[in-house]
């Protein structure tokens, strides 16, 4: 698969949505690799953690920062987006306009009041419901 960044290789693999029930379906994971500059003795998988960190972007944008010359000459450096992140079947909750309203909407109740807490709780339930509705079965299996 072509990569956005030169000198890198990109691919996707299929992984079970539920490892306990592989027949329940699969999801696509995006990978990126910088081949060793020498003779590789193996592959080194890197991910920034998070949750929500893109290992794909980490390698595409900062491989020289996270892997020094010694590592790059001895290992293929591989990054991936975990399920639900970036290029790997991302979790989808709200569109940009809705997300702005959720994050930056102004309450008619004073901050910290019972009414404000009730509004925030209702907004959080709406956000969670939108994630479930727009992401589907995968959401229950995000690691």
Predicted regions and their residues:
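Gly/Pro-rich cap/lid or specificity-loop segments adjacent to the active site
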Residues: 1-143
């Amino acid at each position: 698969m072509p990569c956005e960044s030169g000198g890198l290789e990109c691919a996707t693999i299929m992984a079970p949505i539920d490892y306990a029930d592989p027949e329940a379906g699969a999801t696509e994971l995006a990978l990126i690799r910088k081949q060793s500059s020498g003779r590789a003795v193996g592959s080194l998988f890197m991910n920034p953690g998070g949750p929500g960190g893109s290992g794909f972007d980490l390698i595409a944008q900062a491989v020289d920062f996270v892997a020094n010359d010694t590592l790059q000459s001895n290992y293929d450096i591989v990054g991936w987006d975990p399920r639900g992140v970036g290029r790997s079947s991302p979790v989808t909750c709200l569109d940009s306009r809705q997300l702005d309203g959720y994050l930056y909407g102004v309450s008619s109740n004073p901050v910290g009041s019972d009414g404000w807490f009730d509004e925030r709780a209702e907004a959080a339930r709406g956000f969670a419901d939108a994630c479930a509705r727009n992401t589907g079965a995968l959401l229950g299996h995000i690691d």
